[in-house]
């Protein structure tokens, strides 16, 4: 690592270590990979398993990490009377022995999302007090586990999801709406599992790690109300199908505290991932500064704000002096407004906005990506930004500002070869952003 850095002597005789492009890119990728590795289900799940049941064990689950979590449970308990079924995103399945793995669509549900919900709901019914239900919940479960309520159809559910994703609502707000339009989310699955013992193992992808929000809380009492959901729809002017509007007016409330029981264990989370990223930064000789694991807001606005922080760190040593890395987690949003044909997720949009705001500033590199390996609906986890990113984009015929306005950030980073492609990581602790100031 030392050969990729050099000593720069300042006018007052002081010296500082500076970074070249190769070393900065390598370190940023190691930082991102360390964050992902901290949420490896094989380790996180096994270390948090409950006591073995006297009766049967039924494993259910939903999310991008659910198949890998299920495989860990099956391998850890070879002598337990165990069966089950979980649903994960297409392309994220792995063999899990006695536990059936289904795949469904994300972020917009399909027919398999409904079939998975039906099978999982049936699997937890008819159990006794000596039986154990282990629920494996991770990000993405909201679209993978779908049980329309009222007169809603799959087409209606898809329309709701698409409207929510384009609205600019936070993930918490979107999940509040989803819970009140579902017969399985918002604690309904926990109610169905009674009187069996219920233990939920969660890999969190939501800011603040609220278990009632992760995958829309199928096994957790719901603190939100129908009125809350209706207020969110009004606040963002979201156009819902008539069947969905009827549910918000006439539907039944989700189970509340005292109506369902169960133990919740958080096995991996954004905060843990950021600590792992910080440790990797220290190993590389960088001073890590964690801004928080729950940053939210418009991706392009977040990019502009982060550019200001990075420039202040480089020029003034505030809020941290170079060499340093500024870390953050959480989930930004992208408000599309009128439909566009642009490609890209929230992380590449954040990075393109950051690059535009930095205007090619020297000594600053950045990486941002979704820890599940998929930024939005694209085939990349995210991308990298370097001081020469804008120049290389223009050389490739890309106008960075126009591309940002068109929400076409994926195209910009693909043109310069700076997408970060990991493939499905089989876990999900939301987004990780790291800005290196050399």
Swiss-Prot record:
It catalyses: (R)-glycerate + NAD(+) = 3-hydroxypyruvate + NADH + H(+); (R)-glycerate + NADP(+) = 3-hydroxypyruvate + NADPH + H(+). The keyword Cell cycle does not apply. Pathway: Carbohydrate acid metabolism; tartrate degradation; 3-hydroxypyruvate from D-glycerate: step 1/1. InterPro entries: GK-like_C_sf, GK_N_sf, MOFRL, MOFRL_assoc_dom, MOFRL_protein. Induction: By tartrate. GO terms for cellular component: cytoplasm. GO terms for molecular function: glycerate kinase activity; hydroxypyruvate reductase (NADH) activity; hydroxypyruvate reductase (NADPH) activity. This is Putative hydroxypyruvate reductase.
């Amino acid at each position: 690592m030392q050969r990729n850095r050099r000593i720069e002597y300042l006018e007052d005789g002081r010296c500082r270590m500076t970074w070249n492009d190769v070393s900065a890119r390598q370190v940023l990728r190691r930082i991102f990979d360390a964050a992902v590795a901290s949420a490896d289900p094989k380790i996180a799940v096994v270390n948090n398993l409950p006591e073995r049941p006297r009766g049967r064990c039924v494993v259910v689950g939903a999310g991008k990490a659910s198949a890998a979590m299920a495989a860990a449970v099956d391998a850890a308990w070879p002598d337990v009377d165990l069966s089950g079924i979980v649903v994960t995103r297409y392309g994220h399945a792995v063999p899990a022995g006695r536990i059936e793995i289904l795949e469904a669509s994300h972020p917009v549900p399909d027919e398999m999302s409904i079939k998975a919900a039906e099978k999982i709901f049936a699997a937890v019914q008819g159990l006794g007090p000596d039986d154990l239900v282990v629920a494996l919940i991770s990000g993405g479960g909201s679209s993978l586990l779908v049980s329309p309520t009222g007169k809603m159809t799959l087409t209606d559910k898809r329309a709701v999801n698409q409207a929510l994703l384009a609205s600019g609502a936070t993930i918490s707000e979107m999940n509040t709406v989803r819970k009140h339009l579902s017969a399985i989310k918002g604690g309904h699955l926990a109610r169905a599992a009674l009187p069996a013992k219920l233990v939920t193992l969660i890999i969190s992808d939501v800011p603040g790690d609220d278990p009632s929000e992760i995958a829309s809380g199928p096994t957790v009492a719901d603190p939100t109300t129908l009125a809350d959901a209706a207020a969110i729809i009004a606040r963002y002017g979201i156009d819902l199908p008539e069947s969905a509007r009827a549910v918000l007016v006439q539907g039944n409330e989700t189970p509340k505290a005292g109506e369902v029981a169960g133990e919740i264990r958080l096995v991996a989370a954004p905060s843990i991932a950021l600590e792992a990223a910080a440790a990797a930064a220290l190993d590389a000789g960088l001073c890590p500064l964690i801004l928080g694991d729950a940053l939210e807001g418009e991706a392009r606005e977040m990019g502009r704000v982060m550019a200001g922080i990075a420039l202040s760190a480089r020029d003034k040593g505030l809020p941290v002096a170079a060499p340093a890395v500024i870390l953050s987690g959480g989930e930004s949003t992208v408000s599309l407004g009128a439909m566009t044909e642009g490609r890209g997720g929230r992380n590449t949009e954040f990075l393109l906005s950051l690059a535009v705001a930095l205007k090619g500033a020297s000594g600053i590199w950045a990486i941002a990506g979704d820890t599940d390996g998929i930024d939005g609906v694209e085939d990349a986890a995210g991308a990298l930004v370097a001081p020469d990113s804008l120049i290389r984009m223009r050389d490739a015929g890309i106008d960075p500002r126009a591309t940002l306005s068109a929400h076409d950030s994926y195209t910009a980073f693909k043109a310069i070869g700076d997408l970060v492609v990991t493939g499905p990581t089989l876990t999900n602790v939301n987004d990780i952003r790291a800005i290196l100031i050399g």
